[in-house]
Swiss-Prot record:
Pfam families: CNH (PF00780), DEP (PF00610), PH_5 (PF15405), RhoGEF (PF00621)
Subcellular location: Cytoplasm
Organism: Schizosaccharomyces pombe (strain 972 / ATCC 24843)
InterPro entries recorded: CNH_dom (IPR001180), DBL_dom_sf (IPR035899), DEP_dom (IPR000591), DH_dom (IPR000219), PH-like_dom_sf (IPR011993), PH_5 (IPR041675), Rho-type_GEFs (IPR052233), WH-like_DNA-bd_sf (IPR036388)
Name this polypeptide is given: Rho1 guanine nucleotide exchange factor 2
GO biological process: ascospore wall assembly; division septum assembly; fungal-type cell wall biogenesis; positive regulation of regulation of ascospore wall (1->3)-beta-D-glucan biosynthetic process; regulation of ascospore wall beta-glucan biosynthetic process; regulation of cell wall organization or biogenesis; small GTPase-mediated signal transduction
SMART domains recorded: CNH, DEP, RhoGEF
Modified residues annotated as Phosphoserine in this record: 746-747
Domain DH stretches: 447-634
Source lineage: Eukaryota, Fungi, Dikarya, Ascomycota, Taphrinomycotina
GO CC terms: cell cortex of cell tip; cell division site; cell periphery; cell septum; cell tip; cytoplasm; cytosol; division septum
PANTHER family: RHO1 GDP-GTP EXCHANGE PROTEIN 1-RELATED, RHO1 GUANINE NUCLEOTIDE EXCHANGE FACTOR 2
Length: 1158
């Protein structure tokens, strides 16, 4: 079995030298029983047999975690062909011989590989073998010791142990007399029947990978000025791994992370090195970007469909022809800047034509295998007191750690390797110039020349990398049949885009730098060269913006075209590829652009003040940073658009919800996404049924569940899309989820840095979020996350976007005009404005108040009490007739407006009683008259008593306050109409009345009292109203020759004949409004918790104004009172300091108004 020995020192990821030293002490061994023979490397480089345990060394590889085995011969010389596989500066090497070694694609740094048959294990002539075992072998514990004793590799993936199976396995280690490494890590199992969190075995990479994804919080990270989405830092990964394996040893967590990295679970964003415990290194998950279903139906030849996906159509006489993509001359035509837009347009067209297809492959990749450093010793005779013969025995490492001893390497001299030709090049300026030149300059100038030399040779390497892409990818793919001919040109343009334009610019820059270095061993200035070429760096922006699409198409073609997948595998194994995959080369242009400011800043640091570079280099750096800003913006736009299109394809919802989301809108944004739980206990018992996938858009929050529909994996909406304006988010008090309670440790002494005492795993603490949706169909839902950081991120993202929406959609401005402190011990019931809005009247429980408006901000002066009259529920003003109408205790009164001008308080005897038993009153203009409709309504019938203002008394001034009306009444009875139903609202038309009841809107003729429904019964589109008995009419507005009918649940248009117009136009209110107002082009619906403002032409929700117990006071239709104003009241905020307004005025700025549309 493979065993890992590790130096117990600190692995410093930032220091290449120290890390290289630490890696020398970490070796991987293959150990067999004593009856087998040992391959032992001699000084001559050959391998001979030895009758001891087998040991072969391979150091940790920074770029490739694969092991190699001899194909046939057992005697060979590895020194003839070996190369350095480590990343830059890591100092980790591996020796190989290609003639005898075969690469295993799934083997990692710790000996994880594909399984071999049992027959091979029995042959001593084939020592490098692997053995597989099934779930039953593990569960019954019968085969595990034999596997640990005789096999080199354990097959992956490892199954999850059932309850108590770990204890069964440990019983077979009969030689173990005390707790060992794995027994310390593994918790004991009791007979408790309570739900427990699934045990995570730290040696099983599949389990660690799943837990790693759950606990690690990904997001936006910045490296060298470039923004990376869904990324994480190296130190964050190490922190999470330490928590998973419950250790304080960062070195061990780093090694475990590299085991995951070696199987490409994640990668450095520059693809240049392995996992490092650093705050400066950024990593991303490897995601197999599967194509949307319907686009992955290519056969192995890739010719089953015509692939228009992500490509632009060829145009006649186009400048960006296929030959121009391969050209790197100075006259390379400029590819249109609309390539990304056109490509995404083809995504949309392709997605719309998708048919039912099998489920797409998973987009997440998790490694499988065993991390042997955290496993139990395989030997049955091994114990802590008496160690076995293996030098890599975990107990030996544990013993050395206790004694603070250094783990000794197997081979004292280490192995030699022949590095790649590019690695052999001298990378120091002092090694490339005569010694006398170095001796003539001071230390400051020497450092400056070294950095300049680094700029020059890294630029040369960059150009070589671009030429590698041209020679090994673009040209071969353009001339071979790997890609179907009908898609070949489009594929190359999509994946490689304008990379040869970058080569055209940077090759000339590199030549200029090389020329300067050749002519001047001590380079004086380089800023002037960059000033000439940096303005030509525009291709970098276009290339970076296309990178997300390029990666998507590359992965799609590789998953659907077997020939292309084989070609990729073969080319990436070539020596010229330097064991770097194509994605690593495709990211080099963007990472190179980000490296320029760092390199040039180093040059500037050691540049003398009298050198021209002190002025030129800052200008160059500023120009490059502007390019980086544009690059981040364009890249973010493309990635966002691609994510939205994928979401649109995977989303399963109703057509109405899909139309509401408008995912194809260019301004739509996908801000954040993640997985949460519906139950806190799901984290303890491993339940995935309660997983909710949340997507935060710029306008909605989506809660989805993964479902399989028609053999497709889709995101089905768990709830309807939630508008962010109506969402309230808060924390739930933290509490551990239900699970097994922690037991008292068996020992307080933890001698092993990675060991913990035997106990049940502690209960997982779930951190809850409470989402409250406000509206008619409002609800509350609790969601749980496993980390505080994740919970805080969701709350911050949602609240930040809510603030952005409020500021962006500020159509109406709400201004407080009256404070609660003015009505202490009283309650406001109604209000009305008159005198062109300069004066306000307030009706309260106690009586009538009057106030004047301030000219600067529209707020009120402190109201003056004018009339003692209890429970004034409605006020209305007829300024043309100088009359104030008051409804109090269901009695309608009238009072001349002139009486309000008196300083004295008005006597209630001055009021004139008009009529009683009035439910509500409505004033309007009909039949060329000003009419007042007093509604006496019951459940069974309604009496409409209509009054007319006497024209003879119009504008007549009152002479006496004792008898303000003299012997003549202002309101005279006009007509009276009886209705066999309860009236809810009244609206005046030109010659008729429109009365709203539970049955809908009815038209009443005032001449003959004839009823007829406003809706034409012949229109079948009103059938849905017959099933809705709970709705009630709210208001009706005349708009451009049509009528806008507002109900408690919805609103729609009808024409003058009662037929529904604008068939596709419909408003479904988010709440259940109790009042409506029209301020064209906006319709406002007033619900107790918020005001819903929509565009009356498009039905789009444009603004939400929140409040408590909102009530519409005046709707602003000032046909009688000039200067109509929309007023509403709210409940005061409890315990609020400062002003606490209860009456508000809605102000529509002139820029947002569209004028009357009556």
């Amino acid at each position: 079995m493979l065993r890992n020995g590790a130096q117990n020192g600190n692995i410093n990821s930032e220091s290449h030298e120290s890390f290289g030293k630490a890696a020398k002490g970490f070796r991987i061994f293959s150990s067999f029983s004593s009856s087998q023979k040992l391959f032992q490397r001699r000084s001559s480089g050959s391998i001979t047999h030895s009758p001891t345990a087998l040991s072969s060394t391979t150091s940790l590889n920074e770029n490739d975690g694969n092991h190699f085995r001899p194909a046939s011969s057992l005697s060979f010389s590895p020194s003839s062909l070996s190369r350095k596989d480590s990343g830059p500066g890591d100092g980790l090497e591996v020796n190989k011989k290609n003639n005898f070694y075969r690469r295993s694609s799934s083997t990692d740094d710790f000996g994880i590989s594909h399984a071999r048959s049992r027959k091979e294990i029995q042959s001593l002539g084939r020592p490098h073998t692997r053995q597989s075992f099934s779930v039953s072998d593990v569960s019954n514990g019968s085969s595990y010791p034999n596997i640990r004793k005789n096999s080199v590799h354990v097959n992956a993936p490892m199954p999850s142990f059932p309850e108590g199976s770990t204890a069964v396995l440990l019983k077979h280690h009969s030689g173990s007399k005390s707790a060992s490494a794995i027994s310390n890590i593994a918790p004991s199992h009791s007979n408790s029947t309570s739900s427990r969190r699934p045990y995570i075995h730290p040696a099983f990479l599949s389990q660690v990978a799943v837990e790693f994804r759950k606990r690690l919080n990904i997001g936006d990270r910045v490296k060298d000025g470039l923004l990376y989405k869904d990324a994480f830092l190296g130190s964050e990964a190490v922190d999470v791994l330490m928590h998973i394996v419950r250790t304080t040893d960062r070195n061990l967590a780093l090694l475990l992370g590299r085991a995951l990295d070696s199987q490409k679970m994640f990668h450095d964003v520059t693809y240049s090195h392995r996992l490092r415990d650093s705050l400066k290194e950024v990593y991303q998950y490897r995601r197999i970007i599967s194509p949307p279903p319907g686009l992955s139906s290519m056969d192995s030849n890739g010719s089953s469909i015509e692939n228009n996906f992500l490509y632009t159509k060829r145009r006649a006489n186009t400048s960006d022809s296929f030959d121009s993509v391969l050209s790197d001359s100075s006259t390379t035509p400029t590819i249109s800047s609309s390539v990304q837009v056109n490509s995404l347009a083809f995504i949309t067209s392709s997605l719309s034509a998708i048919t039912k297809e099998p489920e797409a492959p998973e987009t997440e990749y998790n490694p499988h295998g065993v991390f042997t450093l955290l496993t139990e010793c395989y030997s049955s005779t091994c114990s802590r007191n008496r160690l076995c013969y293996s030098i890599s025995c975990p107990r030996r490492l544990e013993q050395q750690a206790r004694l603070h001893l250094k783990v000794q390497p197997v081979l004292s001299g280490g192995s030699t390797s022949i590095t790649d030709k590019q690695e052999e090049d001298h990378r120091l300026w002092s090694e490339n110039v005569p010694k006398q030149v170095v001796d003539q300059i001071d230390v400051r100038e020497w450092k400056r020349q070294e950095i300049i030399f680094e700029v020059i040779y890294t630029e040369r390497d960059f150009v070589r990398d671009l030429e590698y892409i041209r020679d090994f990818w673009i040209k071969p793919l353009s001339t071979s049949n790997v890609i179907p001919e009908n898609n070949r040109q489009q594929f190359i343009r999509c994946v490689f885009h304008n990379i040869m334009q970058i080569h055209a610019v940077n090759s000339r820059l590199s030549n200029a730098l090389n020329r300067t270095q050749t002519l001047q061993p001590v380079v004086n200035t380089i800023g002037d060269l960059f000033l000439d070429y940096v303005p030509k760096f525009e291709p970098f922006i276009k290339y970076g913006a296309n990178q997300a699409i390029a990666k998507f198409e590359f992965e799609r073609e590789k998953s659907t075209n077997r020939n292309f997948a084989n070609y990729v595998h073969e080319v990436e194994r070539l020596r010229e590829s330097r064991k770097l995959e194509l994605n690593g080369y495709l990211t080099k242009p963007t990472t190179r652009l980000a490296r320029y400011p760092l390199l040039l800043s180093g040059v500037l640091k050691y540049t003398d003040k009298d050198n021209p570079d002190t002025e030129n280099i800052p200008r160059v750096i500023e120009m490059i940073r502007e390019f980086l800003t544009k690059l981040n913006y364009e890249t973010g736009k493309t990635e966002n658009r691609l994510s939205l299109l994928q979401l649109n394809e995977q989303l399963s919802c109703s057509p109405a919800d899909r139309a509401k989301l408008t995912l194809f809108d260019p301004s739509r944004l996908l801000i954040f996404k993640g997985v949460v739980k519906l139950k806190a206990s799901s984290y303890s018992n491993g339940d995935t049924e309660n997983d909710i996938h949340m997507f935060l858009l710029d306008n909605f929050l989506l809660l989805c569940k993964i479902k399989i529909q028609m053999k497709r994996r889709v995101h089905k909406l768990h709830l309807r899309p939630l508008p962010l304006e109506l969402l309230s988010i808060s924390y739930i008090e933290d509490s551990p989820s239900r699970g097994s309670l922690p037991r008292r440790p068996s020992s307080a002494l933890l001698t092993n840095p990675i060991s913990i005492t035997k106990s049940n795993p502690p209960p997982v603490k779930a951190y809850g979020l409470q989402l409250v949706f406000i509206g008619a169909r409002g609800f509350s839902i609790s969601l749980y996350l496993n980390t505080l950081i994740a919970r805080d991120q969701w709350k911050q993202h949602i609240e930040k976007q809510q603030d952005i929406i409020r500021k962006r959609h500020l159509v109406f401005e709400s201004r407080g005009i009256c404070c609660q402190s003015w009505f202490t011990g009283n309650k406001l019931l109604c209000a009305v404005a008159y005198d062109a809005g300069r004066k306000l009247l307030f009706g309260t429980y106690k009586g009538l108040y009057i106030s004047s408006r301030k000219s600067n901000n529209g707020s009120c002066l402190e109201p003056i009490f004018k009339l003692q009259l209890p429970n004034i529920s409605q006020l209305d003003v007829i300024e043309e007739h100088n009359v104030l109408l008051l409804l109090a205790e269901k009695i309608l009164y009238e009072l001349p407006l002139d009486a309000l001008d008196s300083v004295e308080q008005i006597n209630s005897k001055s009021l004139r009683r008009v009529t009683g038993h009035v439910s509500f009153v409505k004033t309007g203009f009909c039949m060329q008259r000003i009419l007042v409709c007093a509604v006496k309504s019951t459940v069974l019938n309604t009496t409409l008593r209509i009054y007319e203002a006497d024209r003879a008394l119009k504008n007549k001034k009152t002479q006496s306050l004792k008898k303000p009306f003299g012997n003549q009444a202002t309101l005279k009875i006009f007509t009276e109409v009886q209705m066999p139903m309860e009236a809810l609202s009244v609206h005046f038309l030109k010659t008729k009345l429109c009365v709203g009841s539970f049955k809908g809107f009815d038209i009443i003729s005032l001449e003959n009292a004839v009823f007829q429904s406003l809706l034409n019964p012949a229109d079948t589109s009103f059938r849905f109203l017959e099933k809705r008995e709970d709705i009630r009419p709210i208001a009706m507005f005349r708009l451009r020759g049509e009528f806008l009918l507002c109900y408690s649940d919805f609103a729609f248009f009808v024409n003058t004949n009662g037929w529904k117009s604008r068939q596709s136009w419909m408003i479904n209110w988010e709440g259940q409004p109790q009042g409506c107002a029209l301020c064209y082009p906006y319709i406002l619906a007033f619900e107790p918790d918020f005001i819903e403002i929509r565009n009356a032409e498009t039905a789009e929700l444009v603004q939400i104004i929140m409040g408590q117990n909102i009530k519409l006071l005046t709707d602003g239709r000032g046909l009688i009172s000039e200067g109509g104003e929309i007023l509403y009241s709210t409940e005061p905020i409890p315990f609020s300091s400062g002003e606490n307004p209860i009456v508000h005025s809605l102000i529509l700025p002139p820029a947002n108004a569209a004028g009357p549309a009556l």
